Amino acid sequence: MHTLLVAANPAPRSLTHYVLGRLEAALKPGSVEIADLAEERFDPRFTPADRRAYHDGGNYPADVTAEHRRLERATDLVLVFPVYWWSMPALLKGWIDRVFVNGWAFEYSPASGLRPKLQGLTTHLLPIAGDDCGAYERHGYESALRTQIEHGIVDYCGSQRGSTAFIYRSEQLAPEATVRAVDRAVRTISEAIRARANAPLTKFHGRA
């Protein structure tokens, strides 16, 4: 089992990074790798080169190929991110746009239709929300976010749905309450990953 933690927050002292560190510690001594997209200066822009690679199903830019290699090592992927305007930050969205592409995460053609390729990967979500749980339920924000990511991305690529653990009221809680909220979310994700450790593994079929 190997877990890839992907974080998208430009502030190194953010709650996102605190959660990232707690999650890494909770998963040890298991195999864990961190992709801090802001620190690594990942370029989220979908360029003409990305568009050509998307339509051709190959010849990916070097930085995209490097992300493919990281994902191919992983059995579990955890996306840790602050919720911006009821969705993921542009940096993380750009990572998805550029990395989860035709020919690698899935194959599609009008003749053969869709063939998902990430069956060997389980994807977990840890969104950090500023508002409370009631607001997310009342306005359908949680359902919309989960539909967009879990169904629109995870299911489409054939990845298995893992656990989703929201941290609510991230800018309003007292420090002690914040720690408790982080404890719950980290425990939910880490226990889900450990519970899979003895389950039969499916070979990862991302494109080399």
Give names to the regions the model predicted.
Residues 1-104, 176-208:
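N-terminal beta1-alpha1-beta2 submodule of the flavodoxin-like/Rossmannoid cofactor-binding fold
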Residues 73, 90-208:
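FMN-binding flavodoxin-like domain, especially the glycine-rich phosphate-binding loop
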